[in-house]
From Swiss-Prot:
Subunit composition and interactions: Homohexamer. Forms an RuvA(8)-RuvB(12)-Holliday junction (HJ) complex. HJ DNA is sandwiched between 2 RuvA tetramers; dsDNA enters through RuvA and exits via RuvB. An RuvB hexamer assembles on each DNA strand where it exits the tetramer. Each RuvB hexamer is contacted by two RuvA subunits (via domain III) on 2 adjacent RuvB subunits; this complex drives branch migration. In the full resolvosome a probable DNA-RuvA(4)-RuvB(12)-RuvC(2) complex forms which resolves the HJ.
UniProt-recorded name of the protein: Holliday junction branch migration complex subunit RuvB
Binding site for Mg(2+): 66
Span list, region Small ATPAse domain (RuvB-S): 182-252
Function description: The RuvA-RuvB-RuvC complex processes Holliday junction (HJ) DNA during genetic recombination and DNA repair, while the RuvA-RuvB complex plays an important role in the rescue of blocked DNA replication forks via replication fork reversal (RFR). RuvA specifically binds to HJ cruciform DNA, conferring on it an open structure. The RuvB hexamer acts as an ATP-dependent pump, pulling dsDNA into and through the RuvAB complex. RuvB forms 2 homohexamers on either side of HJ DNA bound by 1 or 2 RuvA tetramers; 4 subunits per hexamer contact DNA at a time.
Gene name per UniProt: ruvB
Residue positions binding ATP: 20-21, 62, 65-67, 128-130, 171, 181, 218
Family annotation (InterPro entries): AAA+_ATPase, AAA_lid_4, DNA_helicase_Holl-junc_RuvB, P-loop_NTPase, RuvB-like_N, RuvB_C, WH-like_DNA-bd_sf, WH_DNA-bd_sf
Amino acid sequence: MNDILNKEPMEEDYGIEKSLRPQFFNQYIGQDKVKEQLEIFIKAAKMREEVLDHVLLFGPPGLGKTTMAFVIANELGVNIKQTAGPAIEKPGDLVAILNELEPGDVLFIDEIHRMPMQVEEVLYSAMEDFYIDIMLGSGDGSRSVHLDLPPFTLVGATTRAGMLSNPLRARFGISSHMEYYQERDLEEIVKRTADIFEVEVIDNAAIEIALRSRGTPRIANRLLKRVRDFAQIMGDGRVDKAITDKALTILDVDAAGLDYIDQKILRTMIEMYHGGPVGIGTLAVNIAEDRETVEDMYEPYLIQKGFLMRTKQGRKVTQRAYEHLGYVYNEEE
């Protein structure tokens, strides 16, 4: 995939995303349904002087799950400790993290679906009853130690909710699905980022960037950064529609946010298989990508935008894809 359209964070994104991160719900653009629900749950928990139920945030990468976790902590007025599933390799790692929590704190675990099962099992009692039992020593000299924990809120984030075990999923009192962003919300995000970067965006350039951002704020901010470079070198420093079109064309991002590989998938299906149906394995071989990459990186957006559909027989290209790429659509094919 064109790196600029990759929803996973790149090294350059980390510092930028932290500087752009909203602190409270009233600064957070988009995800209105999720925000409305969480605001109610947080207010109710604070009124009862209880900790907020554990929260699961799930959805595609780049949609602001980490940002939402920090907003939750700020709205609760508590500290947040951040880690990731792959970083918690053994139960002792989890115990060390839990032992540092203060009453009411938020523990944020990104990529929670990647925790080892032995770690996950320790987490069950911590989430449900705020205690853990740990084994010290080995063999005949081993003994179990009961450790009470302060009440806390676990916020877990995942792009693969289906990979969570049923026992773990059942312990989250709140599950929030983060969805792709509407263009109007992405436009506001681009404008907000431009203000922070002190870049002037004019002539509907923000709309154009939003339309090509694959419904993802991370990509919108990344595109703005790159267009800003073009505006600085090839223009007067202002980001207008003309320089935006030119920059994104050079970057191989078309009007619908499709990159070279997206188009290659659709063109291969149209030219070699008359639009399908075609099996995902066969398609992956034809475009020289592995099956998992096609399924995880490309297919969801193509389906979401109405360019591709799944059938029992395989994947099929839609009439919209034909028209977008300039092919004549024959309904009988």
